[in-house]
């Protein structure tokens, strides 16, 4: 059984001194994160990604669009936006590549290939370009992701909850596609999680965040509408050992994320200050839970997974 990533740590140490074998490759834990746009992987699961990479796991990130419809922070690259040159998507490939490198992941993977589906924009924005991901044929999209599951055979799959975290159409569609792919794939995914934000965890992070830039709008945890209460959460990953990697990845997404000088908070194009917590939370959708702590939470997404 897999406990606290101990097997991965041993394998990583052996590989560091030149010892490798097909059996070792089979024993390496594999985690797949499915996200809607470049930067989502970092904002919601960046600490977890870096945490497991540090422990020798094989981690892959699948991104469903290039984020072409995103707003751009600052003047330097503002004309890349959809209303000007419409070159933001290509630029965000470079940002995603740099962010993944900061997290320890080799390269991005795009569902259907880069640009196969376009960012749908928010629900109230016009459909200026097709094909939008929100309109993707479910059989095609889920089939492509199921093929990735069958090839990679992840022990853990992570995506959004049915509301897409905060309601973005592409996040909701990513949830639907991933859920359908997990059901369709021949590979039986041992554990399937939603990434969620904890009210208590964010409250703790708000309480300790300091030196927030004056130009950012400061809010409280009560102003954040999409948080989960503790009784709805199944797992927490302490990412304090990987927070520097997460902050570096955030800074790589410079057209989308501003990061405070001290790395304790960030803001998107809305300039609303949000703390960067040292924990990331999850809901277990399918699979057997591993050992739980006093709160009733797993502290390792791989807990209880048999790698053999």
Curated annotation (Swiss-Prot):
- Which EC number(s) does UniProt give? 3.5.1.103
The family classification in the record reads: Belongs to the MshB deacetylase family.
- Provide the GO biological process annotations: mycothiol biosynthetic process
Descriptive protein name: 1D-myo-inositol 2-acetamido-2-deoxy-alpha-D-glucopyranoside deacetylase
Q: What does this protein do?
A: Catalyzes the deacetylation of 1D-myo-inositol 2-acetamido-2-deoxy-alpha-D-glucopyranoside (GlcNAc-Ins) in the mycothiol biosynthesis pathway.
Per the record, the gene is: mshB
Source species, please?
Answer: Mycobacterium sp. (strain KMS)
Known cofactor(s): Zn(2+)
Q: Which domain of life is it from?
A: Bacteria
């Amino acid at each position: 059984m897999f406990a606290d990533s101990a097997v991965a740590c041993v394998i990583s140490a052996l590989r560091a001194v030149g010892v490798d074998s097909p059996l070792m490759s089979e024993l390496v834990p594999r985690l797949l994160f499915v996200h809607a746009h470049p930067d989502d992987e970092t904002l919601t699961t960046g600490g977890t990604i870096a945490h497991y990479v540090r422990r020798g796991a094989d981690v892959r990130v699948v991104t469903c669009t290039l984020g072409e419809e995103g707003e751009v922070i600052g003047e330097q690259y503002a004309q890349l936006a959809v209303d000007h040159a419409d070159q933001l998507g290509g630029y965000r490939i470079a940002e995603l590549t740099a962010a993944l490198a900061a997290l320890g992941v080799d390269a991005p993977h795009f569902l259907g290939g880069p640009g196969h589906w376009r960012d749908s924009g928010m629900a109230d924005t016009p459909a200026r370009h097709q094909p939008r991901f929100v309109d993707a044929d479910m059989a095609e999209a889920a089939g492509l992701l199921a093929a990735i599951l069958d090839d990679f055979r992840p022990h853990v799959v992570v995506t959004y909850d049915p509301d897409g975290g905060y309601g973005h159409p592409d996040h909701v569609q990513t949830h639907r596609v991933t859920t359908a792919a997990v059901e369709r794939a021949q590979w039986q995914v041992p554990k399937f999680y939603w990434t969620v934000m904890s009210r208590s965890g964010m409250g703790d992070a708000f309480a300790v965040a300091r030196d927030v830039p004056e130009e950012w709008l400061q809010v409280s945890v009560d102003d954040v509408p999409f948080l989960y209460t503790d009784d709805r959460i199944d797992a927490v990953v302490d990412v304090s050992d990987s927070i520097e990697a997460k902050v570096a990845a955030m800074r790589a997404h410079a057209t989308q994320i501003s990061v405070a000088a001290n790395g304790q908070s960030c803001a998107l194009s809305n300039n609303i200050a949000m703390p960067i917590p040292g924990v990331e939370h999850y809901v277990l959708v399918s699979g057997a839970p591993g050992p739980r702590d006093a709160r009733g939470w797993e502290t390792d997404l791989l807990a209880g997974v048999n790698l053999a």
